[in-house]
């Protein structure tokens, strides 16, 4: 674990075995309530979101966690759903929100990662309008990069921390490494050449086209090992000039506490990348950095989902506790 007190010693977590069962609807959700909302953006889009909150006994009624999904994910599947559900069970409000990168956005040209900042801004605004004055940004996988950039660039006063799960150092680098491992068709360099030629060095949506990459996620020519992009969505999020997709560029600009909860056996993100992100954040001036590896977990935390959730909730709880202590001291001084 890396914290502000112990800067360079990652801790491999190996919790005692716990007997767990799937959530039982009508029982486990009896103490939470949900609110389906629509989140408008400044450029005229709107995205779905759902607020999960404790029915009674919120730890901090003005604190909310904003959860942002990963690649081809959405607000109600996989890790975002688990995080929001369990956060609410533990007394924290959570908004899990779609962005233009959700689902098939990158397949059909709308998933431009540099514009996703408007989607996160819309979600922050939605929480602000509902009375939440303290917000923790929480991103999974690609969502980690998105929330890191948003906080680094915009620094909204409501945000008190950034929590990231399976945080890549560089989305372009991760994809290139995977394509080279499986021998993608086209290769990374060939993809750059194709897009540069077809787009003529510009960003005209009229020139955008769908492109299929074979052997992108596995070693066969079968459809399940292929990826679908458009010229623009790939170039913006995985191309060599995709600055929005480079977390190593953003973490050093964070001025709120940062958590890096990484999978110890992630085939997409080697362990040294988490350590490097922690170092870059600390050297850049981030006030607190927490680095934790979930032993035995892959990128999607298969079989270890609740270990990642537990680590997240522990960090959120510690951060909320310290924030309450600071507010109490301020009230005493003012009084």
Language-model segments: which ranges?
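N-terminal cap/lid segment of alpha/beta-hydrolase-fold proteins
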Residues: 3-58
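The serine-hydrolase catalytic nucleophile loop
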Residues: 72-84, 272-273
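Conserved alpha/beta-hydrolase
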Residues: 82-105
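Conserved alpha/beta-hydrolase "acid-adjacent" motif
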Residues: 267-276
